[in-house]
Amino acid sequence: MSEQTLDNNKAIVVFSGGQDSTTCLFWAKKHFESVELVTFAYGQRHDTEIEVAKQIADEQGVKHHLLDMSLLSQLTPNALTQHDLDIEVGDDGIPNTFVPARNLLFLSFAGALAYQTNAKHIITGVCETDFSGYPDCRDSFVKSMNVTLSLSMDKDFVIHTPLMWLDKKATWALSDDLGVLDYIRYNTLTCYNGVIGDGCGECPACQLRANGLNAYLAEKGVD
């Protein structure tokens, strides 16, 4: 590894302004002294996502980096970047919201930013418990990426995935433990149709989020 030691108290969070990455933000603030966020503009369906990410970063007093990754929308048509496509599940079981190589590229650029800011830790909200079958959300991919990033920059990075083995119910429980359940419920954007908070209630992302929240609140005894 190269001579300059990375700051073990500093973390970069891959941040979209959604439930998962915002939960990761508060998890990071609990575990590290210095936290910065990186958001990627890749031609997603709604500019609102970027505005929400900026707003949360501002409210939490966290430095926010916005990187242009619009080239992703040039590579393949999918329902996250093509507004005229309906969200559907393909024959392989993977929804057309899958953006090939998205997390590969996001973690690569988050690693480059970590290198420049001397941050040892990179945090992403990917999960393979309640997920849509995206191959780049799997634990095996993240572990491989951790090795690749470290070798490519001769730095001893650590990629954290606090939500990897949590379903949505458990993710809500974590946000409650962190004292931010209501903040995340009402200020984040998960909805594919761009509705902040509880969302449209119809898209797959909203249904997954709502089912997890309802299950957690029912277990907690809250109406």
Swiss-Prot record:
Q: Which pathway is this protein engaged in?
A: Purine metabolism; 7-cyano-7-deazaguanine biosynthesis
The UniProt annotation places ATP binding at 15-25
The record's listing under InterPro entries reads: QueC, Rossmann-like_a/b/a_fold
An example Gene Ontology molecular-function term:
ATP binding
| Reactions catalysed, as given in the entry | 7-carboxy-7-deazaguanine + NH4(+) + ATP = 7-cyano-7-deazaguanine + ADP + phosphate + H2O + H(+)
Supply the SUPFAM superfamilies for this chain.
Answer: Adenine nucleotide alpha hydrolases-like
| Top-level enzyme category | ligase
Which keywords label this protein?
Answer: ATP-binding, Ligase, Metal-binding, Nucleotide-binding, Queuosine biosynthesis, Zinc
EC assignment: 6.3.4.20
Q: Name one GO biological process term.
A: queuosine biosynthetic process
How many cofactor units bind, and how? Binds 1 zinc ion per subunit.
Residues folding into a coiled coil are: none
Question: Does this entry carry the keyword Transferase?
Answer: no
Q: Which coenzymes or cofactors are required?
A: Zn(2+)
Where along this sequence does the record place binding of Zn(2+)?
Answer: 191, 200, 203, 206
Q: Which domain of life is it from?
A: Bacteria
What HAMAP family does its record include?
A: QueC
Subunit structure of this chain's protein: Homodimer.
Instruction: Report the sequence similarity comment from the record.
Output: Belongs to the QueC family.
Protein name per Swiss-Prot or TrEMBL: 7-cyano-7-deazaguanine synthase
